Design a protein with these regions (language model features):
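Pre-Walker A-like glycine/lysine-rich segment at the N-terminus of P-loop NTPase domains
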Residues: 1-49, 60-70
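Beta-strand secondary-structure signal
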Residues: 5-7, 19, 80-84, 110-112
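Accessory nucleic-acid engagement/destabilization modules that flank
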Residues: 22-24, 28-31, 50, 93, ...
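Conserved P-loop NTP-binding catalytic core
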Residues: 42-104
Length: 152
């Protein structure tokens, strides 16, 4: 799995970084002093930190908007970091083993972390194919395919 891009929103002084591409060989963050380079890397680190490090809404949400935005929405479910990962062959095989053949064949997945600490992962899947695979493995699935319709 390889990081291909990330986006930081409503974290410290960064309202929306837009999508930042990560090149396979070298990626540089260039900007003036106090422009948010370290903030971007800090948010990316908190997606999956080595040591227990979570977002603290009161400290990490942009201060000048914290009170106003807090009246309008639940800030604990805001996602300050979102990253896109390209899957390698081993990852695709693991997905196939977990979900069944043909259910998930994404080239990339998107993962994020909310202020409340909840991580989420979006994997595009074919729900119909998943159900067909699950029914094929069930001993009574033959009844669903072979029984005549009530109108016959």
């Amino acid at each position: 799995m390889k990081l291909t891009s990330f986006r930081v929103r409503r974290y410290k002084n960064v309202l929306d970084s837009t999508e930042v591409s990560v090149e396979p060989d070298v990626t540089t963050l260039v900007g003036m002093n106090e422009s948010g380079k370290s903030t971007m890397l800090d948010a990316l680190y908190r997606l999956n930190p080595v040591y227990n490090d979570t977002f603290v809404e009161r400290d990490d949400y942009p201060r000048w908007r914290w009170k106003r935005d807090g009246r309008k929405e639940d800030l604990s479910v805001v996602t300050p970091i979102e990253a896109t990962f390209e899957l390698d062959q081993d990852d695709l095989v693991a997905l196939q083993d977990a979900l069944g053949e043909g259910v998930a064949t994404p080239e990339a997945i998107v993962a994020g972390r909310r202020y409340n600490g909840e991580r989420w992962i979006h994997v595009p899947v074919d729900e119909g194919r998943f159900l067909r695979n699950a029914l094929d493995e069930h001993p009574c699935s033959c009844l669903l395919y072979t029984s005549p319709s009530p109108r016959d």
